């Protein structure tokens, strides 16, 4: 297998060093005296040192690199919205859905890896060379099932990655507001859009070695900060845990978790960056296990501490008091979101490069310039729909459900539908899954469940919630869920009554009759969390914790 490809349009990462050493050898063969040999030796040592450093930080293709990439890409800004989902679902459902969708996501990532190996093996039997070409999911579908599957896969995958990048950009603006509210969130979106555009200079997933490692460390800190800070903070006065209060909120929260464990839209690109892609099969499952050690404690602790107050604060950091520890979590999450933006955008860069004919171009500058148009619609959409939290659920139900659950399951069943294809398969289903029969039963269940619960109920609930956000805040919202500025609050009449937070949906308890327990009245805006926070901060810049 040509698994040593760079995955980014570069033939061989060892090429420059080898060429230099070869030139030095020729120089020594033709003579030139001791001085020439001494200079050549010094040059060789410097080149070797640079090559080793570059390999350590820049060129990653091991199974460990793939694990870091999968784990880092899977849990970014969504970590901050999971407590919000717990408030919508309730503690028990939140925990169960995380475990269930984590297992489901690991299974479909395994299917994608098997289809990739099947496609690549067939192509390499025909002497196809992939050293200057990155294989992508839509090409796997094209090679195994034809152009109609390719078109469907390309449409869903690109749209999901587009909005996945939008979500990261929205998350950057939402987070930075907690340590610097001198600028509104829309202005921060402009700034971070320009910063994230620099990801055009990262050639491929092969070059994310140090970034994946650092990104996972940063998310680990943020997750445990939320968990520990929530426990130390304790439950706010009058805390209520009334979720689920409506069927709309319930399925909205469930689809956000579906989105959380649906980060394998970049699985094929990560596999292609590996030196031995055959080792990928269990990597996503191992990454999911680690991610669960971050998401379960942080989400459950935050929900325990703040309860229903999270319904009006889709970012968990909004309710935690400002401290240097929280500021550090915000900064680290910002850096990780920049990295995750690159993860989501890189496959889009590849598609665009192939469209304009520059995918095999050896010039990084030309490719970077060609990639810039991809960033512009992402920037624009982040300004139109700044709804941090609700947009996750909408993307999860409408795009993730098909991209990473339904299409891979159906593609696997259709690819191996004939006895001959099953007999010649590069990789057979594991025995613990029941062989071919068990694999087809599991895939049928995945398709039915995600189609009905994820896309059907989840799509209806998420769109209802999303439309409510648009009706409440409007498109191009300048500062989504921001508290009123102190100067504006001082101008309001003394007897004026503050409006209730508009981010909470009106009660849908009548809709939920017969599904949930007796309807619980919608909780008041719950001043207790904010009262607690305000009691610890006297400076007016420090007590603006609303999202």
Swiss-Prot record:
It is a multi-pass membrane protein. Residues 1-74, 116-151, 209-211, 269-281, 351-371, 415-440 are cytoplasmic. The chain crosses the membrane at residues 75-92, 95-115, 152-172, 188-208, 212-232, 248-268, 282-302, 330-350, 372-392, 394-414, 441-461. GO terms for cellular component: membrane; plasma membrane. One of its GO terms (molecular function) is amino acid transmembrane transporter activity. It comes from the Eukaryota. InterPro entries: AA_transpt_TM. Pfam families: Aa_trans. Its main location: membrane. Coiled coil: none annotated. Keywords: Amino-acid transport, Auxin signaling pathway, Cell membrane, Glycoprotein, Membrane, Symport, Transmembrane, Transmembrane helix, Transport. Glycans are attached at residue 509. Residues 93-94, 173-187, 233-247, 303-329, 393, 462-547 are extracellular. GO terms for biological process: amino acid transmembrane transport; auxin-activated signaling pathway. Carrier protein involved in proton-driven auxin influx. May mediate the formation of auxin gradient from developing leaves (site of auxin biosynthesis) to tips. Belongs to the amino acid/polyamine transporter 2 family. Amino acid/auxin permease (AAAP) (TC 2.A.18.1) subfamily. This is Auxin transporter-like protein 3.
